[in-house]
């Protein structure tokens, strides 16, 4: 895929910003006005160029018919990959760019629900269900999880993979290894957030 021109990148960034701010892509007229094009037709030509480069899809017959195919248009070599998360800095979003070690060339749709990122497993606390040290855990980013599911949880500033159990204001994060005790979280005094649901494991490195 050819890289975007500076102008195409501006158009793409505007589309992303509008979707983030309003939930809807901009019209051609809005693109023209925001970026100083002489007409909506000029905006349309840039959209067609972005579609040819496969970073957006144009939906015919709709004034706001633009769908983003890539979240980061400048990461062309990552377009078919799932981000691999390494060390997570305290207080930072798990998908922050500085946490992404690389991308795996694997179809996220092979997992149900689909994988939004991969997390490198450290330690053997989940080995009894086949999640081993060094494995890549496929994770669907969601906070909608049920007791008994294996989740990626952030306790204060630590990220861990455990089986979830909730009892009132207490949360228990269970290991799948009898050598490890459950992590007990008192929600009245500690911070806990669910980063995602474990949906699969990759052990082979041949897909990188």
UniProtKB/Swiss-Prot annotation:
Its EC number is 3.4.21.88. The keyword DNA damage applies. Pfam families: LexA_DNA_bind, Peptidase_S24. The record marks 90-91 as: Cleavage. Keywords: Autocatalytic cleavage, DNA damage, DNA repair, DNA replication, DNA-binding, Hydrolase, Repressor, SOS response, Transcription, Transcription regulation. The active site is at 125 (for autocatalytic cleavage activity), 162 (for autocatalytic cleavage activity). One of its GO terms (molecular function) is DNA binding. Residues 28-48 bind DNA. GO terms for biological process: DNA repair; DNA replication; negative regulation of DNA-templated transcription; proteolysis; SOS response. Represses a number of genes involved in the response to DNA damage (SOS response), including recA and lexA. In the presence of single-stranded DNA, RecA interacts with LexA causing an autocatalytic cleavage which disrupts the DNA-binding part of LexA, leading to derepression of the SOS regulon and eventually DNA repair. Homodimer. This is LexA repressor. It comes from Aliivibrio fischeri (strain MJ11) (Vibrio fischeri).
């Amino acid at each position: 895929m050819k890289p975007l021109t500076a102008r195409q990148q501006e158009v793409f960034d505007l589309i992303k910003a509008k979707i983030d701010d309003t939930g809807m892509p901009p019209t051609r007229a809005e693109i023209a006005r925001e970026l100083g094009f002489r007409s909506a037709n000029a905006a349309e030509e840039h959209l067609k160029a972005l579609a040819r480069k496969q970073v957006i899809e144009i939906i015919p017959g709709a004034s706001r018919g633009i769908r983003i195919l890539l979240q980061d248009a400048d990461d062309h070599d990552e377009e078919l990959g799932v981000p691999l998360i390494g060390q997570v800095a305290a207080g930072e979003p798990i998908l922050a760019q500085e946490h992404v070690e690389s991308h795996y060339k694997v179809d996220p749709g092979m997992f149900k629900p689909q994988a939004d990122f991969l997390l490198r497993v450290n330690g053997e606390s989940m080995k009894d269900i086949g999640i081993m040290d060094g494995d890549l855990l496929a994770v669907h980013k969601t906070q909608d999880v049920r007791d008994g599911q294996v989740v990626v949880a952030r306790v204060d500033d630590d990220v861990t993979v455990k089986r979830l159990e909730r009892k009132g204001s207490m949360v228990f994060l269970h290991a799948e290894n009898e050598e490890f005790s459950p992590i007990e979280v008192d929600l009245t005094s500690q911070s806990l957030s669910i980063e995602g649901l474990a949906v699969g494991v990759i052990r082979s490195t041949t897909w990188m």
